[in-house]
């Protein structure tokens, strides 16, 4: 193995990264600096994390608050594109990875590290996301991925490894699910979820009520949108992160934002995940409602194309690329008229936009009415239809 002087590890305080600290020191003879990203995973997850890192053998631990930046500079731009991976997944884990990688590189530069490390498995997407970001931001730094090197293959072996070194760890061998949380969402994988025929039990979900346990009375929430960004909730002007937190609090009791999907991983296999994205689901519904009013047909079509490509870009970890900048520039242009107000009804897991208005709305009641009007001459439709269907007519005549 190569020898490094100082390695910055993306540290969570969980079992895997607690074992990685001593493993790096033993196998690479290096000093280990722990880096913890606060992306809104909650105070419970961060409590005592610095002490855990030091107890595991790290010489220092940096906890960096990334919540505001993550929402304003990563989530909100992605929302403007309308990106939804494979029609369902709102990219909660994917959007958080580039800002974590960027902050990790910044800490590495600050402390003079010559390598970076992460606790991603060799089967998952995150190894590609992190290392693609590292390649774009710090191609001179080496990357150590212990899960691709060590012979520790189970939770039991990791616990034994720590016990042999008298390193305290609160994890247990009976943990069922692998979870990842941030301000946007929480993901659940593993356990019985690995069988797609197995219905997830309520113990899987940790954030939202089940629709059955949700209130029997619907709740209305009003969102104000300016150029594709949610700026106010129920009349209260808030920063992006605070808008998200408020909507999470409002939507989660109603069971909003639960999805159970089998997705195509970047590395080639399929995986099943259960995701909870309460506030984000409400935001997306509001932005879609505004788009219905302000985008013409061609613009909506192209936004769908851009959003589909951007969803794959984010999922695949290609944030720091020229393509990302190009698509976001297009999304900005398409969002310049996306200003308005939306009232959404939350009820037993469902979000419905029940009222919407915009100063840039292209909807005209005068043209759309089923009643009598004096702005649309229906006889004009005949000529339009003949021209619109001309190619079909020519093809049919050619077959005679």
From Swiss-Prot:
Protein's pathway: Amino-acid biosynthesis; L-arginine biosynthesis; L-arginine from L-ornithine and carbamoyl phosphate: step 2/3
Residues given in the record as L-citrulline binding sites: 89, 94, 125, 129, 178, 187, 263, 275
Positions with a binding annotation for ATP: 10-18, 37, 119
GO CC terms: cytoplasm
Annotated L-aspartate binding sites: 121, 125-126
GO biological process, one term: L-arginine biosynthetic process
Coiled coil: none
Record's subcellular location: Cytoplasm
Entry EC number(s): 6.3.4.5
KW Cell membrane (keyword) present: no
GO MF term list: argininosuccinate synthase activity; ATP binding
HAMAP family xrefs: Arg_succ_synth_type1 (MF_00005)
The protein's assembly and partners: Homotetramer.
Family, as annotated: Belongs to the argininosuccinate synthase family. Type 1 subfamily.
Record protein name field: Argininosuccinate synthase
């Amino acid at each position: 193995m190569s020898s490094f002087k100082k390695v910055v590890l993306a540290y969570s305080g969980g079992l895997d990264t607690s074992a990685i600290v001593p493993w790096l020191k033993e196998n690479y003879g290096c000093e280990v600096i722990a880096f913890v990203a606060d992306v809104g995973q909650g105070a419970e997850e961060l409590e005592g994390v610095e002490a855990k890192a030091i107890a595991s053998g790290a010489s220092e631990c940096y906890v960096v608050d990334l919540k505001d930046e993550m929402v304003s500079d990563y989530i909100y731009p992605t929302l403007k594109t309308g990106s939804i991976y494979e029609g369902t997944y709102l990219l909660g884990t994917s959007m958080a990875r580039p800002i974590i990688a960027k902050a990790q590189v910044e800490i590495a530069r600050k402390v003079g590290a010559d390598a970076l490390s992460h606790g991603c498995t060799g089967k998952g997407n995150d190894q590609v996301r992190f290392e693609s970001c590292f390649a774009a931001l710090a191609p001179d730094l080496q990357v150590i991925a212990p899960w691709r090197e060590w012979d520790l293959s189970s939770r039991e072996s990791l616990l034994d490894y720590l016990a042999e070194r008298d390193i305290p760890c609160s994890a247990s061998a009976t943990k069922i699910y692998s979870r990842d949380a941030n301000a946007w969402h929480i993901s659940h994988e593993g356990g019985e979820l690995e069988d797609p025929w197995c219905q997830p039990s309520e113990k899987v979900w940790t954030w939202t009520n089940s629709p059955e346990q949700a209130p029997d009375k619907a709740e209305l929430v009003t969102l104000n949108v300016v150029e594709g960004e949610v700026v106010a909730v129920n009349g209260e002007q808030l920063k992006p992160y605070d808008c998200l937190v408020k909507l999470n609090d409002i939507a989660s009791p109603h069971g909003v934002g639960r999805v159970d999907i089998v997705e195509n991983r970047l590395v080639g296999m399929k995986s099943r995940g259960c995701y909870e994205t309460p506030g984000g689901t409400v935001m997306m519904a509001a932005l879609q409602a505004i788009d219905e009013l302000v985008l013409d047909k061609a613009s909506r079509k192209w936004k769908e194309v851009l959003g589909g490509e951007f969803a794959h870009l984010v999922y695949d970890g290609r944030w720091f690329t020229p393509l990302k900048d190009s698509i976001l520039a297009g999304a900005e242009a398409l969002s310049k008229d996306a200003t308005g107000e939306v009232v959404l009804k939350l009820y037993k897991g469902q979000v419905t936009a029940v009222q919407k208005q915009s100063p840039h709305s292209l909807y005209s009641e005068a043209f759309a009415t089923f009643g009598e009007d004096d702005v649309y001459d229906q006889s004009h439709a005949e000529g339009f239809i003949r021209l619109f269907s001309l190619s079909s007519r020519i093809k049919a005549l050619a077959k005679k």
